């Protein structure tokens, strides 16, 4: 969701984490932030404590991030290119949709509500609703389980982040990679079913896939 559908990774999380780290006397570079984008919050805590030392208070850091995010969100966060058109097409076509996001339910609901997108999805699975976050595939397998008549071979996972991309690959579903800010390793690039520059290219791709599968 963050950085794929909504430009919240760039405009919200990058800024809030930078400020929250600075308040504890640390500098967070964009390059360092990009290395853990999309990972579950427990993993992020481990990474930050290793980087900043045992005195780093991750609970305070995370609380401040949410406070800063709420302030930024109140001013509005734009959608990523092609996101609205894609969601409209999927709904009109009767194609099931489910968000699998590391972001917790409270912030997810706020983001989607602010952008009038909450009703665009059949279901949502958030980071605080799985036992193991990305890059573990649990979140995407839980998304798939919401639709009893859909096999994983029929499902597409759209991802912009490295951790989420690995989760998509390991889920057994087909990964559609939409690169944005996050570092993407050679494995996810080589194993991606499709790489598109932004979501404006997704509709044509899905139409082509439907034509291909129905002609087999």
Tell me the role of every PLM-derived stretch.
Residues 4, 101-103:
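Conserved phosphate-coupling serine/threonine residues in phosphotransfer and NTP-handling enzymes
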Residues 74-78, 102, 172:
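Short, flexible loop segments at the rims of nucleotide/cofactor-binding pockets, characterized by
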Residues 14-15, 43, 47, 64, ...:
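Alpha-helical elements of Rossmann-like donor-binding domains used by nucleotide-donor carbohydrate transfer enzymes
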């Amino acid at each position: 969701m963050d950085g794929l559908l909504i430009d919240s990774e760039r405009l919200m999380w990058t800024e809030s984490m930078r400020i929250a780290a600075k308040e504890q006397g640390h500098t967070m570079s964009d390059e360092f932030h990009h290395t853990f984008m999309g990972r579950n919050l427990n993993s992020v805590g481990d990474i930050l404590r290793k980087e900043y030392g045992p005195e780093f208070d991750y609970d305070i850091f995370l609380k401040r991030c949410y406070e800063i995010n709420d302030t930024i969100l109140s001013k509005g966060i734009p959608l990523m290119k092609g996101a609205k058109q894609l969601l409209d097409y999927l709904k009109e076509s009767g194609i099931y949709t489910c968000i699998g996001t590391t972001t917790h339910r409270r912030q997810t609901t706020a983001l989607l509500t602010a952008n009038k997108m909450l009703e665009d999805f059949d279901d949502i699975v958030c980071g605080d609703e799985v036992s193991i976050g990305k890059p573990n595939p649990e979140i995407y397998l839980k998304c798939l389980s919401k639709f009893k008549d859909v096999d994983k071979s029929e499902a597409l996972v759209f991802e912009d982040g490295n951790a989420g991309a690995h989760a998509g690959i390991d889920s057994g579903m087909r990964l559609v990679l939409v690169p944005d800010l996050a570092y993407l390793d050679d494995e996810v690039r080589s194993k991606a079913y499709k790489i598109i520059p932004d979501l404006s290219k997704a509709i044509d791709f899905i139409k082509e896939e439907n034509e291909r599968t129905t002609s087999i």
